[in-house]
Amino acid sequence: MDHADHVGLIRDGVQGAGRRWLELGAGRGAFTLALADLLGPAAEIVAIDRDRGDLASLAATMGRRFPETHLTTVVADFSRDLPMEPGFDGLLAANSLHFVRDPAAVIDGVLPLLRPGARVVVVEYDSDSGNPWVPYPFSYGTWQAIAARVGLLDTRLVGRVPSRFLGAIYAAASDIAASSEPNGTARQTSIGSS
């Protein structure tokens, strides 16, 4: 896959979701660069990865290709608590959640960092069987179940491309409720009457 493929895969999930995004497992940044391209010059992206060298490479590439994008790199394990300010408009997990046994726990753990109405975009191999290089992939059907379990809404397939490795790669988008209630309904408060 090249840059145009990365952009095309996530485009429909990213557009209209705001400009402040958190990315889990950014690596050298193939999808981070696609995100910057889609969000435009006012974008703010926080890229998390355990590999300091990959993040340094990402920062250098971002500076050359998308110098107006505000990129913050954080060396951390995204499966643990992330000490950062909440209020992100979107979360991107592109080919990263297949490295953790329980992707639902990871997503559930980062949801407090997202604003009400935010978007979650996942890119993953469309398979429920892994191998040594991709130990815990999950199909789109499995992602739908995970998303529902953690309270995400309107999960939809936004892109899919064939892959020589595990058949296909898909992108899915889900939304966070626009209110504090998990089903998206506003909490009703009664004020005592006399």
Predicted regions and their residues:
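A short glycine-rich, Lys/Arg-flanked "PGG" loop and its adjoining helix->strand segment in the class I
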Residues: 104-116
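Conserved alpha-helix/loop element of class I SAM-dependent methyltransferases that forms part
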Residues: 1-19, 34
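Core SAM-dependent methyltransferase catalytic element
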Residues: 151, 159-194
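Short alpha-helix
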Residues: 136-150
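Class I SAM-dependent methyltransferase SAM/SAH-binding core
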Residues: 22, 28, 32-80
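A short SAM/SAH-binding and catalytic strip from SAM-dependent methyltransferases
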Residues: 89-103
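A short acidic, Gly/Pro-enriched loop at the edge of an enzyme's catalytic core
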Residues: 79-91
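Conserved beta-strand signature within the Rossmann-like core of class I S-adenosyl-L-methionine
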Residues: 117-125
